[in-house]
Amino acid sequence: MNSIKKILLSSVLLFGINSVAKADCGTITIAEMNWASAEMFAHVDKLILEEGYGCDVELVPGDTMPTATSMMEKGEPDVAPELWINSVRIALDAAVDEGRLHYAAEV
């Protein structure tokens, strides 16, 4: 009986924490770039953020230069799932060094 109480308590805590995480997510903008693989990744990210974390997600049209520039100057969109960073590498690295942007992975 004691282990059943522990399991129930753990479940209640787990679901409570999950609800808080969903409430804190807010609205996230994702760049839907103008090539097929990037469009696919944007939709996968949208699905994960909406279904897994309860976020409100808005897909915004994008292309390499305008999206990178907007991210560096305005902080939007929040996510660019696939971006040809070598075309804007120096400016992006500077924005990262200044703390305005973060790479999800080093490439």
Spans of features found by a protein language model:
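Intrinsic disorder/low-structure terminal segments
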Residues: V12-L14, M40
